[in-house]
Amino acid sequence: EIEFQNDDREELQYSAAFTVQNPASKGRNQFVEKELRFLTTQYAEDHPQFGELCLATDADGEISYQEYWYRGGWSDSLETYWRNFTEQSTLKVRSYEEPGDRDHGTLCVRKTVPAGHSVRIRFILTWHYPNNYNYWAPEYQHIMWKNYYAVLFSNARESAAYGLANWDRLYGETKRFKDELYASSLPEAIIEAISATMSVIKTATVLRLEDGSIYGWEGLRKDAGSCEGTCTHVWNYAYVLPYLFPKLERSIRSLDYHYNQDENGRMQFRMLLPLGRP
């Protein structure tokens, strides 16, 4: 969310632009209403790398876009974009028929702000990569399951629409929690410890399986999880889930009793994926 404050004596025109690079090596970018979609043409819908991004806005100003930056050599694409943005009142449409290699696309909103007034422009970026699999165990890579958000939303456009429609509630509830935590009488060191460890549950350290159950790594490497299995010697000492989201904590215990306990009552300390794997 970007805010423009016009302190001039006359009305001014303001433009805000959001640029995204399509991560697909063979992809296409597509404008639909107030959205830019970043699609892949390389993979089938049941492939682990199939998916899309969606960049959207709910602004009521003048919307322009470039589905593609100029495909040139060296830094031609960036230089051409900057000239387009600074020298034109609105972006001129640029499209290519052939799929590209990680093309950039830009969504832009232009608004008139009266003297002494301000305006806010919202953008939201969502993704939808529905298929997950055990990439660290080759013998099980043929078994896939859905990420939980793929059960809730059928594509990135749906989650973008949800995010914009519920923006004020989601932001308000998050800010209220943050404000009350930092306004509490707890010692500063305790507040820091709570906030630092709490942030882990919104990272890729945590997965939600197809039924919504929680699965966690011990930590993360740059591009992979580190030490699988919601292991008990890490997650049994975590307090965020049981105190803030007890149903999610309970899902870990339910999985343990269903998949990790043997006929003698002994329980393994790692949950292996796919579920039910020996």
Name every feature range the model reports, one short phrase each:
Residues 4-231, 248-250:
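Acidic/polar, glycine-enriched structural segments that form the non-catalytic walls/loops
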